[in-house]
Amino acid sequence: MRREDPRLAARIRAALGDVRTVLNVGAGAGAYEPPDLDVTAVEPSAVMRAQRRAGAAPVVDGRAEELPFEDDSFDAAMAVLSDHHWDDHERGLAELRRVARRRIVLFTWEPRSLGDSWLVRDYLPGFARLVPPGYTLDRLLEALGGGRVEPVPIPHDCWDGFLHAYWRRPRAYLDPQVRSGISVFGLLDSDQVAHAIERLAADLDSGEWERRNGELLELEQLDLGYRIVVTEVVT
């Protein structure tokens, strides 16, 4: 289930810095939009736009690859775990550069971390095939013209419900409601997902999961490849 985690929100807000106007691209239901900033949201899904809470930032129907704004319209552009959904990643990044006059902030994920995830390694190996070809952090930085990268370890009790949020709470993945908030489960073949969940349930009941991953239960947070990327726009 997806909801804003205040610790992650604080990291994103700090990365935005002293800007005033922000465009949130692939904004979804509006999580992580700083309430103290003048935010405009772009979201292509009518379903997600309808889920935005009352009083949320105004939202425009649009795609990252064709942002309906003039050049340099905002102090900053941001995207939170949405860039991997874009049809044309490099074009979307170019559009962020076009409309942002000062800063670009992405909360994203490094595909090279796949091997660090017990969920993908042991149960969802097919996820690797869903990663767009050429989607790497290096390519992202090149397309943005550089930037700094900040690791974002995920706390064991993360409020948000993205793919790796439950790394220390494996039974959560057995809940269909939890899985419904994670896009990967909808993209994978349903038989593959069912088999993975059956195996996970069996491994949890037998103690096999804890035998393989018990050291994780002692950790407060874990680096699973989530990153904040900050690019200062040079004009």
Task: Describe each region flagged by the PLM.
Residues 2-20:
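Conserved alpha-helix/loop element of class I SAM-dependent methyltransferases that forms part
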Residues 19, 74-75, 101:
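Local beta-strand N-terminus motif with an aromatic residue
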Residues 21-67, 91:
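Class I SAM-dependent methyltransferase SAM/SAH-binding core
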Residues 65-76:
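A short acidic, Gly/Pro-enriched loop at the edge of an enzyme's catalytic core
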Residues 76-90, 110:
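A short SAM/SAH-binding and catalytic strip from SAM-dependent methyltransferases
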Residues 149-235:
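Conserved Class I S-adenosyl-L-methionine
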